């Protein structure tokens, strides 16, 4: 299943990794472009999950259209106070 995970915080990153290990094609969306680039470069969410590798098969992007286009499921893992910005 093609899944978009909106929100690259602790919960969003954890869900993306678990969904990937359960055989799904996952795209992880991060609001801040600079942090998305850091996640791509390091493949570790140093702010929320230091030491936990993000598998290279998980696509990381800050482009919400790229993240949600042609997906079977969209997971919303954004804190409620930031929902308006999504």
Report each predicted region and the residues it spans.
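Rossmann-like NAD(P)-binding element
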Residues: 52-86
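NAD(P)+-binding Rossmann beta1-loop-alpha1 motif at the extreme N-terminus of oxidoreductases
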Residues: 1-52, 59-62
């Amino acid at each position: 299943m093609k899944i978009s995970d909106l929100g690259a915080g602790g919960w969003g990153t954890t869900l993306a990794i678990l969904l990937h290990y359960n055989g799904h094609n996952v795209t992880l969306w991060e609001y801040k472009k600079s942090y998305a680039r850091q996640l791509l470069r390091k493949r570790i969410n140093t702010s929320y999950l230091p030491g936990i590798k993000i598998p290279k098969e998980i696509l990381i992007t800050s482009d919400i259209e790229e993240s949600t286009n042609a997906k079977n499921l969209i997971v919303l893992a954004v804190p409620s106070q930031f929902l308006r910005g999504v």
